């Protein structure tokens, strides 16, 4: 029987490990991008699905607005309304966008897109430059909208009959 499994090298493992820890952004790559650069990248890669200025297109809904909507019951799901930490936006874009070419964008492009979308949501100024240090510092409106599950991890035998 042929041996198909090979031990993975540390260098190969690093290339696959693109996890980003929130809220501190541990794992964000080196790079940077501005709002102005993000607008150009958005227009070249995103506008067909997400519409002009991320207000919604023929394929997907808006990526702007909805801030505070989680408190009203009519939830509008946008990065500005739902993400508790800005590095989540970077992580999502890097892993899954553009839809037809996921993980095709360089870190600088993802930082620029993040800056642009955060600016459209009114969360950073038009002259903002996002990088591994500035992105985690963005205060997202829904930062306190999640509960931390601090229950202890326990293991117990499942009771199937005569349980108390």
Where are these regions (language model features)?
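Electrostatic cytochrome c docking/interface patches
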Residues: 4-41, 57, 98-102
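Stable alpha-helical elements in mature extracytoplasmic
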Residues: 12, 34, 85, 89, ...
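Short clusters of hydrophobic/aromatic residues that line enzyme substrate/ligand-binding pockets
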Residues: 16, 63, 135
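The canonical Cys-X-X-Cys-His
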Residues: 38, 42-53, 113-117
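Gly/Gly-Pro-rich "capping" loops immediately C-terminal to redox-active cysteine motifs
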Residues: 39, 55-94, 98, 132
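Amphipathic alpha-helical interface segments used for dimerization/assembly
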Residues: 46, 89-90, 94-97, 111-121
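Flexible coil segments in periplasmic/lumen-exposed cytochrome c-class electron-transfer proteins
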Residues: 105-164
């Amino acid at each position: 029987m042929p041996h198909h499994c090979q031990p993975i090298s540390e260098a190969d493992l690093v290339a696959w490990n693109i996890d980003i820890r929130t809220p501190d952004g541990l794992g964000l790559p080196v790079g940077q991008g501005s709002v102005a650069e993000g607008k150009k990248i958005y227009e070249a890669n995103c506008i067909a699905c997400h519409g002009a200025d991320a207000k919604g297109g023929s394929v997907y809904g808006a990526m702007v607005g909805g801030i505070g909507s989680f408190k009203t019951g009519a939830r509008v799901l946008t990065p500005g309304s739902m993400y508790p930490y800005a590095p989540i936006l970077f992580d999502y874009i890097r892993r899954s966008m553009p839809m037809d070419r996921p993980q095709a964008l360089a870190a600088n492009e993802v930082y620029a897109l993040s800056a642009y979308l955060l600016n459209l949501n009114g969360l950073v100024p038009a002259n903002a430059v996002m990088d591994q240090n500035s992105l985690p510092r963005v205060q997202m409106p829904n930062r306190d909208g999640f509960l931390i599950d601090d229950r202890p991890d326990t293991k117990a035998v499942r009771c199937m009959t005569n349980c108390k």
